[in-house]
A protein has these predicted regions:
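PRPP-associated nucleotide enzymes
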Residues: 1-129, 134-222
Length: 222
């Protein structure tokens, strides 16, 4: 796991995925400013998304192995993440699993429907591949889509960063709420604590660390 984290830090720092300045962001149904932002949208080339896919694949292999039927990438950011993870699982470990994703707008021509790719069936174990969880809103929008596929099980979700932020209920993170509400175990490549420790190693970020630490003390459960 340490190798996964180290590679993830170095790669994200190089690609400018860490943004360390005030960003207006929605959290737990409220808008607030955060001094840091992690954006997988800055992965813009084949090489970059391939590396990110390897980080997800390594985490999947380490935690659930082959014990799932298919992976689902929620629109929009989850689509390339699930695609990259599926390709990397096969290329790195010889594990070939189907994947699918949803459309934001249901298509009424061609193949039609709101899902693209694998068609889930009763008894399937689905894992979700997503960017981050902040308020858990995206998960709550995703679950009706998956449950609408039939009697499927969704036990695990994989994200790049656990921001460890409080959710709707005081004293609980959004990830804790997702686990209690849906029974989903969320696996993150890194946590905000990991990122904080990594950034402390570079003097470049000394000016932002106090604001980051204040934010974490106020909004995070560590």
């Amino acid at each position: 796991m340490t190798e996964i984290k180290d590679g993830f830090y170095a790669d994200r720092k190089q690609k400018g995925v860490y943004r360390v300045h005030d960003v207006r962001r929605r959290a737990a149904f409220r808008l607030r400013n955060t001094p840091y932002f992690v954006n997988t949208g800055n992965y813009k080339t084949g090489e970059q998304i391939a590396k990110l896919g390897k980080f997800y694949a390594s985490l999947i292999k380490e935690t659930v192995g082959e014990d799932f039927s298919a992976m689902f990438g929620p629109a929009y950011k989850g689509i390339p993440l699930a695609t990259a993870a599926a390709a990397s699982l096969y290329n790195e470990y010889g594990i070939s699993k189907p994947y699918f994703f949803n459309r934001k707008e249901e298509k009424d021509h061609g193949e039609g429907g709101s899902l693209v790719g694998y068609k889930p069936k009763d008894g399937d174990k689905i894992i979700i591949i997503e960017d981050v969880i902040t308020a858990g809103t995206a998960v709550r929008e995703t679950m009706p889509i998956l449950y609408g596929c039939g009697n499927v099980k969704v036990n695990d979700m994989f994200i790049s960063v656990n921001r460890c932020e409080v959710g709707k209920v005081p004293g609980k993170t959004a990830i804790m709420e997702v686990n209690e509400e849906f029974g989903i175990k969320v696996h993150a490549i890194v946590t905000v604590e990991d990122i904080h420790e990594y950034l402390k190693q570079s003097e470049k970020y000394n000016n932002i660390l106090p604001a980051m630490e204040d934010y974490m003390a106020k909004y995070c459960i560590l």
